[in-house]
Amino acid sequence: MKRRSDEEISAPLYEYDAAIRAQYGFFAGVDEAGCGPLCGPVVVAACILDPEKPVYGINDSKKLTEKKREALFDEIRDKALAYKIVFVGPEIIDRDNILNATMSGMKQAAEGLDIVPNLVLVDGNRVPAALEIPAQPVVKGDATSASIGAASILAKVSRDRYMMELDKQYPQYQLAKHKGYPTRLHYELIEQYGIQPFYRRSFLKKQGYWPEGK
């Protein structure tokens, strides 16, 4: 079976975007990375792609290798008309819950773009209620829209890089390996080394890893 080229992979996503652009003009894709981990931030990105400078290979970031995501990350930043990356830390996640924290990050990212879009497409089934720009949810948007796919790559790579840096400070937690997600290894390391400030208290309480009242 012939392997599809990057251009062939991205073609349907760019066709989707072209139809949206024909109706609305400038629009942004928004996506997040890191809703599920036990520690670290949730990262949200908004991106307005330049239709004259396509980035071939864009797809749902989870379907791409780390090497491919890294290469696309740099190309997206070089070619995009505008992009914004927002980090929402564990303290906000614990205070507001992960959904509200993510929605807040999406609002900040979309409204923080250097170009004000006429529409925001958000991956998933809901949009931030307080967003001052018209928005539409797109289920599986990161595999449907090139702009959302680009945002998913920006968010994923940004978060992974953050966790790699955190790993250098706390090598005993092996954050570079699991990126903070709730793996068996991660739970074993928490039991062995305890809790650090970058952990999400609300997540750990649900799993019985955080003393009540703290």
Regions found by a protein language model. Name each.
Residues M1-K214:
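RNase H-like, Mg2+-dependent phosphodiesterase core
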